[in-house]
Swiss-Prot record:
Coiled coil: none annotated. The lineage of its organism: Bacteria, Bacillati, Bacillota, Bacilli, Bacillales. Global transcriptional regulator of carbon catabolite repression (CCR) and carbon catabolite activation (CCA), which ensures optimal energy usage under diverse conditions. PANTHER family: ARABINOSE METABOLISM TRANSCRIPTIONAL REPRESSOR, LACI-RELATED TRANSCRIPTIONAL REPRESSOR. This is Catabolite control protein A. The keyword Transcription applies. Residues 1-57 form the HTH lacI-type domain. Residues 5-24 bind DNA. It holds the Pfam family Peripla_BP_3. GO terms for molecular function: DNA-binding transcription factor activity; transcription cis-regulatory region binding. Gene3D superfamilies: 3.40.50.2300, lambda repressor-like DNA-binding domains. The keyword DNA-binding applies. Keywords: Activator, DNA-binding, Repressor, Transcription, Transcription regulation.
Amino acid sequence: MTVTIYDVAREARVSMATVSRVVNGNQNVKPETRDKVNEVIKKLNYRPNAVARGLASKRTTTVGVIIPDISNVYYSQLARGLEDIATMYKYHSIISNSDNDPSKEKEIFNNLLSKQVDGIIFLGGTISEEIKDLINKSSVPVVVSGTNGKDEGISSVNIDFESAAKEITEHLIEKGAKSFAFVGGDYSKKAQEDVLVGLKDVLVQHELELDEQLIFNGNETYKDGLRAFESLATAKPDAILSISDEQAIGLVHAAQDAGVNVPNDLQIVSFNNTRLVEMVRPQLSSVIQPLYDIGAVGMRLLTKYMNEEDIDEPNVILPHRIEYRGTTK
């Protein structure tokens, strides 16, 4: 039988309001009364209902987390960072997988609101117009981590993908690359746009250009990397920038199967630097994103909104660096 707040109050011989104050950490309770109530809570193994507490205090100490693909290593590392900070600030997370489906995201978003969450955090993915509208009308604060929400007026944490793309392109040109291709994905459209801007800007400076036929869009998976190479192979690019590690590994394997030497004939760079980059030979050159920090800082930003703290910068850009390994010269 479920133990209720009424049972605790009766056993401790106090009012239900007093039990509620103890459970919610209200300091306006005598120490001896607090100790007595806590003893009864422990004795009866009472577990407060978060939603019921939320109705009284207008807070449930829960946050909703929406992830495009929880099985993706990139998003799991973001999730670890946010979960640690949520725990530090005594929040519980409700994690939901959206499959990058706007209709499913909308359903999850509304479901989280119905659960009285105190805030919502999106991990990566693309912010659709429908979701942007929901965020702007939301009764609770929302932060996105792993994508840039500045243009949409949404608080966010990310790296500067445009700057990273410029650095990579300059390096590859220095190493002899003249023909470039780009492999993107549906999960990271904003990052993809920024990478293409940086790539094209540097190519123009060197009197080169990116053939639109050498832009491949997929779902950021290993199989998409295989398909991308098949699509791009006849053009024989010198270098490929890939938005995800899984895609890039597919590119490496497809190139090797076709007898193309990586990196002598084809240089490949990815943008995630998950643990997968060291599991392929040659090891994958990649942009090192502070994935754990992106998730952690996103959650900390959300806690500031939920606790009505001062916000110095609603759109945080964290530093990145590039690790050139075996897939580049």
